[in-house]
Design a protein with these regions (language model features):
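Small beta-barrel nucleic-acid-binding modules, primarily SNase/OB-fold domains
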Residues: 1-146
Length: 146
């Protein structure tokens, strides 16, 4: 496991973040896209208006957890390369400056479900349960008519 300080450029959605990564000694990787490993959040860029409400809530929660600075934990393959997902994004997990893993927080609060690959249909039941939980807690309000 490797640990890097990074500057958050943009939270794309609840499980994807654009960052500049500080490799140390003044060396930076700029504009890297990181996929948070082990979770799936509702999509924030979708034609499903209800899902979008929950996706934007997950995105906002991740923004509040990360702020401008975060710690990125990544794994390196046997070839010495950062692990990458199917869309070429670095796979890793972010920690807040207080040391908390963002993935764990998002799961515990109902903004994300555990996901280790495979069909996203397998996670639908848990996503729907999370939706109801977030509504019941008053964390997310779905506008009437959606």
């Amino acid at each position: 496991m490797y640990e890097y300080k990074c500057k958050v450029l943009r939270v794309v959605d609840g499980d994807t973040v654009d960052v500049d990564i500080d490799l140390g000694f003044g060396v930076w990787l700029h504009k890297e896209r990181v996929r948070i490993m082990g979770i799936d959040t509702p999509e924030s860029r979708t034609s499903d208006k209800v899902e979008k409400v929950f996706g934007l809530a997950a995105k906002e929660r991740l923004i509040s957890l990360l702020g401008e600075d975060a710690i990125l934990d990544t794994q390196v393959s046997k070839k010495g390369e950062h692990m990458k997902g199917k869309f070429g994004r670095i796979l890793g997990n972010f920690r807040t400056l207080a040391g908390e893993h963002c993935a764990d927080i998002l799961i515990s609060e109902g903004h994300a479900v555990e996901y280790t690959g495979g069909s996203k249909e397998d996670t639908q039941t848990q996503h729907l349960a999370n939706r109801q939980r977030l509504i019941d807690e008053g964390t997310v309000v779905v506008p009437e008519g959606l």
